Amino acid sequence: MSEFLTPERTVYDSGVQFLRPKSLDEFIGQENVKKKLSLALEAAKMRGEVLDHVLLAGPPGLGKTTLAHIIASELQTNIHVTSGPVLVKQGDMAAILTSLERGDVLFIDEIHRLNKAVEELLYSAIEDFQIDIMIGKGPSAKSIRIDIQPFTLVGATTRSGLLSSPLRSRFGIILELDFYTVKELKEIIKRAASLMDVEIEDSAAEMIAKRSRGTPRIAIRLTKRVRDMLTVVKADRINTDIVLKTMEVLNIDAEGLDEFDRKILKTIIEIYRGGPVGLNALAASLGVEADTLSEVYEPYLLQAGFLARTPRGRVATEKAYKHLKYEVPENRLF
């Protein structure tokens, strides 16, 4: 996948912190999530209590990290940021937990990647605001219970199915983020352009939005590249011509597909006669890992209606045939 269209963080996402919304009012989209979160935040503040633990789940690039920072901002408290893969030993987690002050937010990204020992230490911290640590080794080792300050854990995951039941059940607030509409992305792009001190036409913002795969991170990334084109051609505002020139350079088509996306669909249509084809067979034909194909490439193709999953395998849809200008088989059932 093009580095410009991956929903994962890349080097092209540096220097965008100033574009992040600082409050729920500034946050565009995810209306149901915002309503639930706003209610919980307001109630916690009115009662003077620590906010319940929050799990933010959904595909990458939709704003989970931004929401974690907004939670801390709305509560006017500190946020401590870490991630599942970084917390290797119980001592790593204990050091963070014992440094928290009352009401602080502990944000753990990729929380589904916590190892079992660290996760188990977290259980009592979440539930009782206590941790048990072992002092010494062998027969003389003993467990010491330490009280910690009440805090709010905010966990983010792109794969909520990998969370253990004991961990998931300890979150009082579970919020599922979904892909954004073109209208929402258009507003995000216009806001970003304004903050970058760039004028953008409405039709140009919509053109970028349609290529952003329902993901704000991609929308911002593409807007930055369009701004580069604006600078090079020495124009005074972003219009549709400038957007089209940029997308041509980036090899991104009108549906937001790049060269490898099109290769996936062409492989299914040409080699496997439109499918169904199993994940492993398709991955082998494309020269990628099966997990990479299912987790990185497929979500947008499924969401946009170019690909369908059936009990027998992946199938290219009628939309895929038409987009790639293949003749749709007369006897084919989609």
Swiss-Prot record:
Disulfide bonds: none annotated. Keywords: ATP-binding, Cytoplasm, DNA damage, DNA recombination, DNA repair, DNA-binding, Hydrolase, Nucleotide-binding. Mg(2+) binds at residue 65. DNA binds at residues 309, 314. InterPro entries: AAA+_ATPase (IPR003593), AAA_lid_4 (IPR041445), DNA_helicase_Holl-junc_RuvB (IPR004605), P-loop_NTPase (IPR027417), RuvB-like_N (IPR008824), RuvB_C (IPR008823), WH-like_DNA-bd_sf (IPR036388), WH_DNA-bd_sf (IPR036390). SMART domains: AAA. The RuvA-RuvB-RuvC complex processes Holliday junction (HJ) DNA during genetic recombination and DNA repair, while the RuvA-RuvB complex plays an important role in the rescue of blocked DNA replication forks via replication fork reversal (RFR). RuvA specifically binds to HJ cruciform DNA, conferring on it an open structure. The RuvB hexamer acts as an ATP-dependent pump, pulling dsDNA into and through the RuvAB complex. RuvB forms 2 homohexamers on either side of HJ DNA bound by 1 or 2 RuvA tetramers; 4 subunits per hexamer contact DNA at a time. Has 3 domains, the large (RuvB-L) and small ATPase (RuvB-S) domains and the C-terminal head (RuvB-H) domain. The head domain binds DNA, while the ATPase domains jointly bind ATP, ADP or are empty depending on the state of the subunit in the translocation cycle. During a single DNA translocation step the structure of each domain remains the same, but their relative positions change. This is Holliday junction branch migration complex subunit RuvB.
